[in-house]
């Protein structure tokens, strides 16, 4: 059962006093705006980071500055796509103008960003994937790290019921299914686009080059501790 916000901040402060951590990783699948606000008002006593959704709160300069003062070193953000139509069809609830404003506000506040983008989803095409490239190029100065992933179709998902699916191999017991992309934007084409177009762009390459081998999102905030 989730902790109430006040209890969460009190326990974080108690643990920080007891353990004297260099960095706190908040493991919520998505830190709520209410908890973000509480962390800004009642800092845990050590730098912290975690995953959160793009909301209007993050598009506010003053709110982001308060997060920084409260110890926020980095936020992991699932933007997923730079094409609004794709986001809407996926039901992500993400508004790209808000995402743009949030990235700029976080940059201004001195909070690092680790941004996640997903390619090869059923509503995506190569053209809309290029919109994602355009989005990253436009916000290259506000994105510190990138995670670029190819979509895996969960076998029990609603999407799987409306797509032509198949096992990856005979006797496949995995949680995911291979599928025929409705627009022909198959995994091999997506992978080729990522490797030969997306990652080759100088703006993207510069961000990726700042990520050492075997480096994960849990190493990233250490580069931004003050």
Which sequence ranges carry the predicted segments?
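Short, solvent-exposed turn/loop segments enriched in Gly/Ser/Thr/Pro and often Arg
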Residues: 27-33, 120, 148-158
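C-terminal accessory regions of radical SAM enzymes
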Residues: 127-226
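Acidic/polar loop patches that form or flank catalytic/metal-binding clefts of enzymes
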Residues: 22-24, 114, 143-148
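Radical SAM [4Fe-4S] cluster-binding motif and immediate context
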Residues: 1-112
């Amino acid at each position: 059962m989730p902790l109430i916000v006040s209890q969460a901040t009190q326990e974080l402060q108690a643990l920080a006093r007891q353990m004297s951590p260099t960095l706190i990783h908040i493991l919520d699948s998505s830190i709520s705006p209410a908890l973000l606000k509480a962390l800004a008002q009642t800092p845990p006593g050590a730098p912290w980071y975690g995953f959160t959704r793009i909301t209007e709160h993050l598009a506010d300069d003053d709110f982001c500055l308060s997060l920084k003062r409260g110890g926020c070193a980095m936020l992991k953000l699932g933007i997923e796509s730079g094409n609004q139509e794709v986001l809407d069809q996926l039901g992500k609830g993400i508004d790209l103008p808000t995402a743009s404003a949030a990235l700029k506000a976080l940059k201004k506040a001195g909070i690092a960003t680790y941004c996640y983008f997903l390619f090869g989803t059923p509503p995506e095409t190569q053209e809309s994937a290029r919109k994602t490239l355009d989005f990253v190029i436009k916000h290259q100065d506000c994105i510190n790290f990138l995670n670029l992933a190819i979509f895996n179709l969960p076998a029990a998902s609603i999407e799987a019921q409306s797509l032509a699916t198949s096992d990856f191999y005979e006797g496949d017991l995995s949680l995911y299914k291979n599928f025929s992309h409705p627009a022909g934007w198959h995994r091999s084409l997506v992978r080729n686009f990522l490797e030969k177009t997306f990652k080759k762009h100088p703006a993207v390459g510069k961000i990726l080059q700042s990520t050492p081998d075997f480096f994960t999102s849990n190493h990233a905030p250490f580069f931004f501790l003050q």
